[in-house]
């Protein structure tokens, strides 16, 4: 039988929503897509313009960094620029253990602990254990934002913290 490792925590979990429309990149109207990989420095950048159904345009840039010396450390920076509108953009970012197993099509993790703190020094942490082999993984992140309002770090569905 083929061997398939359970998906671990998704530490890049990000959802972006404008006026009730959530970005689903595989279905969205996207233009000016650019992706660059800098292997020497461990940096992946991706940017594009999301053309919303109501005519609004939002430029989105992701910068993902993996430490070249401390392999368990990674970071993601998301930059949002409203190109033709003023208004609110909702972004959810966090840690998610709800990815299904590739062959069994079910989640193979049980959440053991979730830690979070809202506000200026927001923090999220999640610990999961595989259902069959009891392997444990803990993932944590600091959440920083340069915006007017930043709150509501919370637990969602006992499978993720966003």
What residues fall within each predicted segment?
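Beta-sandwich/jelly-roll carbohydrate-recognition scaffolds of carbohydrate-active enzymes
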Residues: 1-162
């Amino acid at each position: 039988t083929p061997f398939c490792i359970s998906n671990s925590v998704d530490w890049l979990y990000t959802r972006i929503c404008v006026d009730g429309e959530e970005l689903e990149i595989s279905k969205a109207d996207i233009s000016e897509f650019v992706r660059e990989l800098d292997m020497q420095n461990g940096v992946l950048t991706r940017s594009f313009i999301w053309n919303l159904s109501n005519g609004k345009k939002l430029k989105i840039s992701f910068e993902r960094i993996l430490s070249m010396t401390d392999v368990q450390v990674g970071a993601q920076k998301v930059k949002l620029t409203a190109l033709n509108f003023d208004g609110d953009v909702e972004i959810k970012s966090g840690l998610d253990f709800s990815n299904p197993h590739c062959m069994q099509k079910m989640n193979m993790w049980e959440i053991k602990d979730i830690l979070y703190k809202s506000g200026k020094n927001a923090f999220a942490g999640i610990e999961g254990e595989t259902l069959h082999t009891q392997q444990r993984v803990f993932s944590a992140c600091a959440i920083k934002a340069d915006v007017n309002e930043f709150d509501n770090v919370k637990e969602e569905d006992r499978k993720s913290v966003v």
